[in-house]
Amino acid sequence: MLMAVDIGNTQTVLGYFEGERLRASWRMTTEPYRSPDEVGAACAALFALRGLSLEDADAMIVSSVVPDLTGTYRHLAADILQVPFYAVGPEMDLGMENRYDDPSAVGADRLVNAVAARRYYGAPAIIADSGTATTVCAVDAGGAYRGGAILPGLYVSMDALASRTAKLPRVDLEEEPPRAIATNTPDSIRSGFIYGYAGAIDALIRRFKEELAAEGETEGLRVVATGGLSPVISRYCREIEVLDPDLTLKGLQVLYALNASRAR
């Protein structure tokens, strides 16, 4: 069993793989200062809820944007579970070219999404990931990671608005805005965030398509949405073709299979 871990700034997603099959997944709050024992206990409890055992893990792979927690999971794998540990980073073989100016500066989650999109949807591809940050990234027709765009996530922007204004509340974005032209303040905020972010993502995707088209890179292009907030926002996006909430976990499994086989 492979334990795949996607550590984000707000949430950590765990995946349990049998071969290429994602058997179960869980989300928990990212808490950077928890000890390996505490993290292990939390993971074990989540596994047990599905009738699974953490001790069945025979390897762990981690994608992390929180460096402190990378070390925590490394310790959990090596010293407690005593299984091989893989961390997505500059030294890992991605099986694809990384054409970022500084390849080591790309967020691990962005690379993992690119790997998964190419594997499951082909190249070229555009990936929109809606989480703590919203990212839109491109894979060209040759299968290379080309880079992308980053903007604040929905709730990061919501927190900024609520904290910097006296009369604009934090609202639940899971509730659908009835119309773009809203007639009360909560719905006006929902309209601005939902339709505004959907429009921003669509605009970026269209610009990506234009730039890739100028290089003859758009034949067969797919546009994929993922991330914890993707179910909220993607249905309002006109450019999104596929919603795959498990894309990052699937990319981790692809990278594990590639790197574990070469380590043997």
From Swiss-Prot:
The active site is at D109 (proton acceptor). It holds the Pfam family Pan_kinase. ATP binds at D6, I7, G8, N9, T10, Q11, T12, V13, T132. GO terms for cellular component: cytoplasm. A monovalent cation. Ammonium or potassium. It comes from the Bacteria. GO terms for molecular function: ATP binding; metal ion binding; pantothenate kinase activity. Its EC number is 2.7.1.33. Belongs to the type III pantothenate kinase family. Homodimer. This is Type III pantothenate kinase. It comes from Rubrobacter xylanophilus (strain DSM 9941 / JCM 11954 / NBRC 16129 / PRD-1).
